[in-house]
Amino acid sequence: MIKRKESKKSILKIIIMFLIIFILFLLYAYFIGTKGLIVKEYKINASIPDSFDGLKIVHLSDIHYNRTIKEKELKKIVKQVNLINPDIIVITGDILDNDIDATDSKEILIKYLKEMNAKIGKYAVNGNHDLRYDYWNDLMESVNFKILNNTYDLVYYEENEPIVIAGMSSYFDDIDINEKLKDYYNFISENDVKYKILLLHEPDTIDNINNNFDLILAGHSHNGQVRLPLIGAVVLPNGSKRYYKEHYTINNSELYISSGLGTSTLPLRFLDHPSINFYRINTK
C-alpha cells in the first residue's frame, strides 16, 4: 500500500511538473515570443545593374493586424523600417486577419503604412487572409503601395537599365498559376532584363512556375511560428509544407521566406521572433 501511494504521488508530481512547464511555455510564447522585433539582414551579391549597387530592400509579411500586432507594435515596425532608410519596401501578404473596415483600427493601419518611406517604391501582393476583404486593394493603394498581384513593374534608378519586380496573388484565389505570370513571361521573352524579383505569399507555389527569377520573396509559413528544439516547426499551413525556413537556393533562384510580424491561428511564437527582413544587394 505504501509503495502504491508513493507511486501515485510520483505520477502526480510528474503531471504537475509538466503542467507547470506547459503553462510557462504558453506564457513565454504569448508575452515574450510575440514581442522582441528583430531585423534579419542578408547581404546578396548578384548580377544587378550598376546603378542599383547597394540596393536596400525591406521585406515585411504576415502582419495579421489586430491580433498580436496593434498600434504600439505598428509604430515600432515603422520606426525600424525608416531607420533602415530602404530603397524599396515589399509586403508579401496577410496584412489583414479580421475585418477592420469602418473601424478606428483601419485608420490606424493606414496611418502607419503611409509613414513607411522608400526612396524608389513600395510594393505588395495579397495573402490568403487578405482575400476575404474586398477593400484590401483600395487600402493598399491609399497608402501608396503598388499592387503587383499577377503583374509586374519595371523599376528604374538613375540610369536607363531597369530591374523588374513581379508579383503573384495568393494561390487560394483559384486563378491558374500559369495565367498569373503570363504578362510577365511575354515581356521577358522580348526584353533582356538583368535582375528579376518575384513577390508571392505561399512559397510552395514556386514548384509550379518557370524558374526565371533571381530573387524570390515569400511569407505565409512564419518560419513555423512555434518551433521546438530537435523537432522544428510544429504546424505548417498549406502552401508552405515544403518551403518554410528562412532561405533556400533553388536552381538559380534565391528564395527568402519571412518569419512574419504577427501570428496566425494561435497568438503564440516560440524560438521564432517577429522580424523584418532587410536585403542589401551588391553587384558581383
Identify the meaning behind each predicted range.
Residues 134, 138, 142-145, 151-152, ...:
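Binuclear metal-dependent hydrolase catalytic cores centered on His/Asp/Glu-rich metal-binding motifs
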Residues 57-59, 90, 123, 165-167, ...:
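Structural motif
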Residues 203-280:
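Conserved beta-sheet core of the metallophosphoesterase superfamily
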Residues 64, 96, 128-130, 152-153, ...:
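Catalytic metal-binding/acid-base residues of hydrolase active sites
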Residues 1-50:
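N-terminal membrane-anchoring alpha-helices
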Residues 45-58, 145, 152-167, 192-195, ...:
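Beta-strand-turn-beta hairpins that frame and shape the catalytic cleft
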Residues 51-154:
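Membrane-embedded segments
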Residues 36-69, 187-197:
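Mobile, glycine- and charge-enriched loop segments
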